[in-house]
């Protein structure tokens, strides 16, 4: 069964008084363990499609199923619960709290996750990911003192800390140098 199923979704926005179609009749299936890349030029609707897939936005038409559950028509509380259960996000602008340390930022999703682990287990996961992404020495550093690439890697770790089944990444390597974008 598909973990994420997007069927004929469309989304329009109003730009002043003009209706702009950001996504038109898109469909895709993603199975557990699959990696899918959506590519296209700036302004082609990639971020909007990710927001539809991650149930941040509701489609104007079409349907979205997450782990076989239809998302269309769910109230805000149920949509939020589903997002927290299934999705990790890496957004273009990192969405990190500047005054907090990298570690504090990484731990934010654990406050909302139903998949509670022990503090020791979270430390083990963070240590492993930070080592792989070469930011072990930055975990106690305030985010405002990190480079763009370091912030990006902290955002990547944050998206993975709760073992989410689906990671949605909007330009996840945009701030990384060539060496680190391969990791």
Task: Please state what every model-predicted region is.
Residues 54:
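Helix-to-loop junction immediately C-terminal to a conserved catalytic motif
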Residues 62-70:
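Conserved ABC transporter NBD signature motif
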Residues 70, 119-138:
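Conserved ABC ATPase "signature" region
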Residues 167-170:
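Catalytic Walker B motif of ABC-type/P-loop ATPase nucleotide-binding domains
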